[in-house]
Amino acid sequence: MKLKYGTIIFSGLLGVSAILAACGARGKFDQVDDGKIVLASSLTSKGAANALQTIVKKYNEVKNIDDYPIEIIQIAGGYDGGRGNLQTKLSVKDKNSFYNLILNYPDVVSVLGRVGMELPFDKVRTDKLSPRFLDFNKRISAISKQGIYGIPVSLSTEVLVLNGPVLHYILSSAKGSSGKTQVSQTSSGSNQQKTLQKPLKIDTSDSSTSSLWTQIENAAKNNGKKANNSKSNRRSTDQSTQTHNDQGDASESDKKIKESWGDYEEVDGGLKGFTFKASIFDNWHDLLDFSTRAAKSFKKIKDNNTKKGTDIQGILGVDSSANSLFTSVFAAGNGDYDNFFYKVANGRADFSNFKNRGSSFQNLQSVFNDYKGLIDQNGLFVNKGGSYSSNFQKFHQLAYSISSTSGFYYSFAGNSAKRLKFGDNSFIEYPQYTVPIKAPSKNGDGNSTNSNSDLLGTFTLSSVKKSTDKSKSDSQQNQGKKVEGTPNQGKKAEGAQNQGKKENNSTTIEIYKNKIPDGKNAGKDAILIKDNNLIKQLEDAAKKNGAESNQKQGGESNVQKEQIIGYTTTGNVREDGNHIFRVDKINDEQYDRKIIVGVTVETLEQSSTLQSEEAIVLAAPGKYKSTDKKKVTITQGPNIIGIHANEKENAETQKFVDWFLNTEVDWPAKENSSNKQDQQNSTKKQTAAEFFVESASYILPLKEIFENKEKKENTSNSDKNKSSSQRKNTYAEKALELFQQISKDEIVSYSDPSDFRSGKFRDGIGSNFNAAVSSKADFNKFVKGFIATLGSEI
């Protein structure tokens, strides 16, 4: 059924969507000209958000005196929150507090188009961008005429990240350590040898497989070296004179992985007699088959139906179920939107292929059934609202995962792997920008006064400075959501953004219940807690720690040790009202402050964690089956999107966007380089768009980096799109490689066709698939639930 925007109201539509549908193009309105251009941002990456602030400040400094200044408003809730906020403002025709630009996905353009509020960038020069990455503008419904409505300023794709040490243990166990011999451990702790009936074979006659196996072996050797170093440290503590092997031993890594993964079992339908080839990672069908076989081979996976946070989570982790289903179904349909769930042509969306159970419906059933075997073996981990696979993979709890290339900075553990562990065995990585909360002082040690019974605790912040360590500010969007990761954790993460510079730059913040006493100022040097649950937990922790301290102290010392009763952070952790609570900000902080209670700090050995050099980064599967003719790669990321305001503001909006894309200016080098020499230089000349992508693991789709056949070599020495973070970032390297192939038509780019209903379609298929993973539902139950969530609007 083809649906023309502005003519039909579907009974199942969300309230806001129904209002917009009723208005149609007649809903267009002018905003009040307030003499400024407002950019709405839902960025949760601190690096990207800080870069955007720097860009706006720069524009306001260099613009002509008569040009309108730019200001940023932050919208909570990520891109979904931004979309919802925009829909609300459209529905009430907000003329006074709307915005001119928004960073979001192209379906927002469709929402705007239904009421005539889209703004074409017809005055913006986009000739620097590769046209392949502007093609999505042809697949946006509800716009009145073809044009450029969204400009990709931060592209990413997905990669398949292999955990080298874990995969080595799986394969080595299945093929036997020597010939057909498998070494296992008895309940008494002694080793015993077991003969494998049909060991796994690694097809090293295939050059790709041989190369991949070498990479896997090297990763295990590196992890084995860490295990040996840990042993050496323990021996040194015991005053042993033994030395360790600096070369690294893969068998040492296998022993360490085995502690958590358990013994390999040779079973029918598992890895017994299987031939391993690198090509299994090229397509979804073979990847899921291999994953299912591996899951069947380990009891700690297949027999664990109720996984705790510290358990092995499975073989394969998937961060976006919708992405995986969409790309596999698109690939199964020969990379053709005519064979996809829906398509957009001539400004109209057509869902008939799915609705009429056409090829996309049949392909979805095939894909789902491939997943079903892995689901039944408890071998699939899916992200259910914040628990990203990188959190588990970096602690060797997954064999491999499919993740966004924008997530490089939080995908690996630091030199000191720390996490905050809750009583139920769930955990979050020790967030950056975190300081401990100390119990009220009882002996006048300078931390606080103890005369006020309402004082719950104190924490210390250093003076916040403009420039922060770039490598520690990137990609915070996925941090700390209970069993979720944080980038570069463990690298002295204790402290606020610039803690520990000088003692005399620090400020002690006091936490109170009931009321803040005279002489203290809320939001400056004091916080008032109103949540009774949080108050009780802080008080109980102080009492418990105080009692333990008195028992331990005895006659050893008259100086009381500082008692930690919780932690506070501005990292992007999600409050749950149980252990993580939102509290007031200090000194107008840009990010929400949280208090975390009921946790203990856990430090893991390095051999229990995944380092970046131990990961093998591959493209996410580009085909559904190996016989498919076309290879598919997803392109994703927010676009800069214009919103109609009035004639003057529309012109000023386009002027800013054109400057953002095309005008080279001097930027402070220390803001966008991790190279120490670069940080000593005063400036670096580039466009604002180039400066922005360097803030995180993003790609700007410039023609010059795709059209040059020797792109990698030339770009590494070029001032264009050169980012020290990108060149050392294996995820971005893989993204550049894939995007170059897209620009040459060697592979097909997939992005969601943009319609006002596409967000609901995506959310529906993802949430129902995740529910099917939990319930182990079959395809009929899954698709029935999915269709029910769509209602009558599709």
Curated annotation (Swiss-Prot):
Q: Where is the lipid attached (S-diacylglycerol cysteine)?
A: C23
Q: Respond yes or no to whether keyword Cytoplasm is given for this record.
A: no
Primary localisation category:
membrane
Listed A to Z, the keywords are: Cell membrane, Lipoprotein, Membrane, Palmitate, Signal
Sequence ranges of Polar residues compositional bias: 177-196, 238-250
Which region ranges are annotated with the description Disordered? Answer: 177-208, 220-257, 466-506
Q: Which InterPro entries match?
A: Lipoprotein_10_C, Mycoplasma_lipoprotein_cen_dom, P68-like
Q: Indicate where a lipid (N-palmitoyl cysteine) is covalently linked.
A: C23
Q: Which Gene Ontology cellular component terms are annotated?
A: plasma membrane
PROSITE patterns assigned: PROKAR_LIPOPROTEIN (PS51257)
Give its localization.
Answer: Cell membrane
Q: Which domain of life is it from?
A: Bacteria
Low complexity: compositionally biased ranges: 220-231
Q: Write down the membrane topology.
A: Lipid-anchor
Signal sequence coordinates? 1-22
Q: Report the family membership.
A: Belongs to the MG185/MG260 family.
Cross-referenced NCBIfam families, in alphabetical order? lipo_P68 (NF045826)
Q: What is this protein called?
A: Uncharacterized lipoprotein MPN_284
